[in-house]
Amino acid sequence: MKGDQTIIDVLNDVLTAELTTINQYFLAARMLKQWGFDRLAVYYRKESIDEMKHAERLIDRILFLEGLPNVQRMNKIMIGENVEEQLKLDLDGELVAVKRLNDGVQTCRDLRDNGTETLLREILVSEEEHVDWLETQLDLVGRLGATAYLAEQLKE
């Protein structure tokens, strides 16, 4: 089915962000494991895999619309030098993703592409859940202090 190029561009923009986030979260998971924070490492690895599933669905939709998925383009990967900085950088990135997805949903509405709108809404819900998790973690760091928070992250 031939899709609107504007929609394909939106999908490729979201795909670029997802591909970047896969790598960012995978590297963060490995760093967290190296630092001994196994609980956070497991969470980040799972999130990396979730982002990969989003990318897969985006690629499938682009191909369905007879577009070409751009898997060569990536944004800058943002890695923190400590856990709190990583959480903050990830929250910043997820907030940008939520805005991008909301804008994409609106574009889909304007161009009457309900199938792509549904896909972007589903990814949006996942990203909003991750925003909530990151905000909670940063709140815990603030209330407990970094040392107590990190002590809770040592074991799965």
What does each of the following model-derived ranges do?
Residues 1-156:
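Iron-associated oxidoreductase/ferritin-like identity signal
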